[in-house]
Amino acid sequence: MAGGRSTPRTGSAGIRWASTGRFWWIWAWWAAAVRWYRPWRASGGRSTSLSRSWRRPGSARPCAGRWGGAGQQPLRIRDYGAGKGYLTFALHDHLTHQLGLQVETVGVERRADLVALCNRLAQKNGMAGLRFEKGDILRAGDAPQGLQEGQEGLQGLREDVHVIIALHACDTATDDALWQGIRQQAAMLVCSPCCHRELRPQLQAPAPLTALLRHGIHLGLEAEMLTDGLRALLLETQGYEAQVFEFISPDDTGKNRMILGCRTGRARPAAEARAEIDALKAFYGIRHQRLDALLQASDGLSPS
């Protein structure tokens, strides 16, 4: 850093992280965790130090003081659909032990056995500030009326949240995680989607693309691109700067797409963004998209 400004960096797929450490440190952490955390987790946390897994030990330091209230209040992180906690453990360890930050991390997972397993591991390894809770992404009473699905409520998650993460939240669970982040006005949303099943059955090949989309593989790729493109546009309507990119080599995982949103509080003009979203949906014959429906049912969530 020079003169109080971070140096622009170039990340995966040539992405240039201009003007802020708030973006690129998340990319560095996520890529490293996917590659090198699994051996530690497979060992039950006994034989391998998380700190030895990090190939970019100082990558996050320039952004450590960028959070409001840094040093006065903890950085609050929610991992929705935490599963076995691969990234939850890695991120919490990196921020607390590598960067010395005060962090409160909660992994949210529906399966009680995984919640119990991860809590045992966290306690066994003395990871203060990290816990896992059983529940659904959309909690009863929080989802807009008509879109609740019998979700199990969570305890103690009403406070401000700074970072929302979701790794491979299946299909519309990614939309639910993004909506929760928007609702909680999280500073950063980091989601790696998978499955993309919602739009594919609705997708109608427009006349110019019929010859291309008659192939199943092309139709699937088009549905993925459309799904994540709409999600990014919707984030922009809520005051987020949004990017969609590959964050890690496909040799590590084929599910290597990331949606990254950083809250700026400056939303795109509503009419302009709505026109783009509606035009895309009409072009492909899309009748319903989960995040769009959540936002409309809650009358949008205006940025502040």
Where would I find each of the regions flagged by the language model?
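Conserved SAM-binding loop of SAM-dependent methyltransferases across substrates and taxa
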Residues: 84-100
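Conserved S-adenosyl-L-methionine
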Residues: 78-81
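Conserved SAM-binding motif I beta-strand of class I
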Residues: 104-109
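Alpha-helix termini
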Residues: 58-71, 95-100, 147-156
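Phosphate-coordination loops involved in phosphoryl transfer and adenosine-cofactor binding
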Residues: 72-74, 102, 161
